[in-house]
Design a protein with these regions (language model features):
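Active-site anion-handling motifs in enzyme catalytic cores
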Residues: 1-266
Length: 266
């Protein structure tokens, strides 16, 4: 209703850097499609799956542009601030680290030992110290702590700071990121850090498909060998600077769309 109210008050309406869905109820899909089509002037989307969702909802009036998530433009904190944060968490800057970003979800508990075994495997074979990172601490910290409790090698559990720039900077220090959380994957992609996605929701696979990123698997299909194969592949790739620059350029198109809408004659 905020969209309709804004338009009725004479404002131009831009849906900025959105992901659409899932909206499963037929009635809700019709209602959402009708409101968006009637009251929105332009939409920028973070991946192509959302464009298909809008098309299926019957949205044809607004100008739709597939760009990338605006979070990709979040710059890392200064190096000294990142190093101070990691030191405060007990991380040795001389060691290399593998980041796990896990979250509660139905079916996760039975897969938890597989993530713990992967953490131990890469410590034993590559010397990568596992870091279990709670991106949304209130929800994710119990999962991070429970997984870490299954690990016998040296490891760290970190709750995300409030400073997003610090989060991005920390991720830039990782050898690879294994994540269920979409925004951890977005941050890693924006930095070019090798990533492995664990999909619990179509928005995660939609983002990775848009990146043409094949290193992901559904949570229910996680197995020791398949998870290890994807992590091996990610580590072999190394940092992808070209991909990071391309994504940031796409994310900047959100701002360009907003500027165009403001400059249009009423």
């Amino acid at each position: 209703m905020n969209i309709a109210w804004a338009k009725k008050r004479g404002n131009r309406v831009l849906m900025y850097g959105c992901g659409i869905g899932p909206v499963s109820s037929p009635g809700n899909r019709r209602a959402a499609g009708r409101i968006i089509d009637k009251y929105v002037d332009a939409i920028t989307l973070r991946e192509s799956h959302s464009a298909r969702e809008l098309q299926d909802m019957g949205v044809t009036h607004p100008k739709i542009t597939v760009t990338a998530d605006p979070a990709l433009l979040l710059d890392p904190a200064p190096a000294e601030a990142v190093e101070a944060f990691l030191a405060a968490q007990g991380l040795d800057p001389a060691r290399k680290h593998l980041l796990f970003v896990l979250r509660p979800w139905p079916g996760f508990e039975e897969k938890m030992p597989l993530f713990a075994r992967a953490a131990e495997e890469y410590y034993e074979t590559r010397g990568l110290v596992p870091v279990f990172f709670a991106l949304e601490p209130k929800r994710d910290l119990p999962v991070a702590e429970a997984t870490a409790a299954l690990v016998s090698c040296p490891h760290h559990v970190i709750a995300a700071p409030h400073d997003g720039h610090l989060i991005v900077g920390m991720m830039g220090k990782m050898e690879a990121v294994v994540s269920m959380r979409l925004h951890a994957l977005i941050f890693a992609a924006g930095l070019g850090v090798p990533l492995v996605g664990v999909v619990y929701d179509p928005k995660v696979s939609g983002f990775l498909d848009y990146l043409q990123e094949t290193r992901y698997l559904d949570l229910e299909t996680v197995a020791e060998d398949t998870l290890s194969a994807l992590i091996d592949d990610a580590l072999a790739q190394g940092v992808n600077g070209y991909s990071a620059r391309r994504l940031r350029a796409l994310a900047e198109e959100n701002e360009q769309a907003a500027r165009r809408l403001l400059e249009e004659a009423p």
